[in-house]
Amino acid sequence: MITVVTIPRSVSWKGDAIAVLNQTKLPHSTEYKTLTTIEEVWKSIVMLEVRGAPAIGIVAAFGLALASKKYTTLHIEEFQKKFNRDCNYLGTSRPTAVNLFWAIDRMRESIQEITTIKEAQKILEEEALRIQQEDEAVCRSIGEHALTCFKDGDNILTICNAGSIATARYGTALAPFYIGKEKGVHLHAYACETRPVLQGGRLTTWELKQAGIDVTLITDNTAAHAIQTKEINAIIVGADRIVANGDTANKIGTMNLAILAKYFDIPFYVAAPLSTFDITKQTGAEIVIEERDETEVTKIFGKQVAPVGTTVYNPAFDVTPNELITGIITEQGIIRGDYKREIASLFEKTS
């Protein structure tokens, strides 16, 4: 029996505006925010109202389609100049998430041969919708492949939120939970709360509960103890950037889990679409790591919890070395072994 799973949508195109699920309001209220300018799109990404590498790429694509609509009276050369400026502007919002730049480049390339602004506007809207539709299919495929790594009743640990609200639908790391639910395969999620912004506590638990999937929330510090005492069978995480040798940038704390997985001899999987790969970079040392505002650490929900003036180091991501990764699950299948060779081979086949 197939179960229909209700999954919330993160981004919706309204023709003259973008509706985004405001993730800063979760889990207390489900509010969709309307974005009507590229400046609002940029701010929504920076403020984490929309987040998750694929979702950021989707909203950026819609943002460029939206911005193009205000340039109707320009000459085509001036249109291209302003459009390129908008592309560069959106690229400053989140430097680590490669899907952002992938989507921007794809939108830019889609109108290279246009001769009229009306044609460009039509193509940009169609391309943004295509990016969203493709991401949903990609995430479902990731979920299908990931589900082959697990069995009914498995306890699986994750961090941050690589779920439906971080993508077009299904998510990456959470996709096997949804596909499993549809197929009657019961997987139990253990979600790290994910300090300092609590994406695990606020978002992963919220969306899995919405879908009726079993989830247990733990503090980040509990991960080792949970693996030791709760029969955790595997760890699965998403990714914000995977480079040519398989080194993976993901939410800060991910590398901690990879090290624990190696110690306890359980599989550590990364789930991500091919659009998250950056094969122009050879190792994780080349990845630019975003550092965020100190108040994310010194305050919790606006309340000061550390002495004023405390020095803070607040990187948003860390880089997990490829040797700690059991497999990278993509829409094309699972990459294992010699990541540099296998990733190069995969991109040769798909190019």
UniProtKB/Swiss-Prot annotation:
The protein's Enzyme Commission number: 5.3.1.23
Enzyme type, top EC level: isomerase
Amino-acid biosynthesis keyword on record: yes
Zinc in keyword set: no
Site feature: Transition state stabilizer: C160
One GO process term, biological-process aspect: L-methionine salvage from methylthioadenosine
Catalyzed reactions: 5-(methylsulfanyl)-alpha-D-ribose 1-phosphate = 5-(methylsulfanyl)-D-ribulose 1-phosphate
InterPro entries on file: IF-2B-related (IPR000649), IF-M1Pi (IPR005251), IF_2B-like_C (IPR042529), Initiation_fac_2B_a/b/d (IPR011559), M1Pi_N (IPR027363), NagB/RpiA_transferase-like (IPR037171)
Keywords, in A-Z order: Amino-acid biosynthesis, Isomerase, Methionine biosynthesis
Molecular functions (GO terms): S-methyl-5-thioribose-1-phosphate isomerase activity
Coiled-coil annotated spans: none
Residues noted as binding substrate in the record, renumbered to the chain: R51, G52, A53, R94, Q199, N250, K251
Active site: D240 (proton donor)
Pathways per UniProt: Amino-acid biosynthesis; L-methionine biosynthesis via salvage pathway; L-methionine from S-methyl-5-thio-alpha-D-ribose 1-phosphate: step 1/6
Name of a matching Pfam family: IF-2B
Protein family membership: Belongs to the EIF-2B alpha/beta/delta subunits family. MtnA subfamily.
Functional summary from the UniProt entry: Catalyzes the interconversion of methylthioribose-1-phosphate (MTR-1-P) into methylthioribulose-1-phosphate (MTRu-1-P).
Subunit organization: Homodimer.
Protein name: Methylthioribose-1-phosphate isomerase
Lineage: Bacteria, Bacillati, Bacillota, Bacilli, Bacillales
